[in-house]
Every structure is written in C-alpha cells, then in structure tokens.
C-alpha cells in the first residue's frame, strides 16, 4: 500500500527535485553579486 502511494508523493516533490540542482548556483551568483556590490562601494 505504501509503495503504491510513492508515485503520487514523487509527483508532488518532482518540481522541488528539479529545482534543487539550481539552488547552489543561485547562492554562488548571489554571493558574487554581493561581493561585487560591496567592492564597488
């Protein structure tokens, strides 16, 4: 019964799993922009 419910749960979290690899890149870009903004002052 639990195994039959897994696909439904996966469909709910699928978008989050697709976005997860992009999050570290966004953090790197945010850190780079922040350092650039502080450096330009």
UniProtKB/Swiss-Prot annotation:
Main subcellular localisation: plastid
CC per GO annotation: chloroplast thylakoid membrane; photosystem II reaction center
UniProt-listed InterPro entries: PSII_PsbK, PSII_PsbK_sf
Assembly mode: PSII is composed of 1 copy each of membrane proteins PsbA, PsbB, PsbC, PsbD, PsbE, PsbF, PsbH, PsbI, PsbJ, PsbK, PsbL, PsbM, PsbT, PsbY, PsbZ, Psb30/Ycf12, at least 3 peripheral proteins of the oxygen-evolving complex and a large number of cofactors. It forms dimeric complexes.
Protein family per UniProt: Belongs to the PsbK family.
Gene behind this protein: psbK
Biological process annotations from GO: photosynthesis
Known function: One of the components of the core complex of photosystem II (PSII). PSII is a light-driven water:plastoquinone oxidoreductase that uses light energy to abstract electrons from H(2)O, generating O(2) and a proton gradient subsequently used for ATP formation. It consists of a core antenna complex that captures photons, and an electron transfer chain that converts photonic excitation into a charge separation.
Protein name: Photosystem II reaction center protein K
Domain of life where this protein originates: Eukaryota
Pfam families to which the protein is assigned, alphabetical: PsbK
Disulfide linkage: none
Transmembrane segments annotated in the record for this chain: 12-32
Subcellular location: Plastid, Chloroplast thylakoid membrane
The keyword Chloroplast appears for this protein: yes
Keywords on record: Chloroplast, Membrane, Photosynthesis, Photosystem II, Plastid, Reaction center, Thylakoid, Transmembrane, Transmembrane helix
Membrane topology: Single-pass membrane protein
Propeptide: 1-4
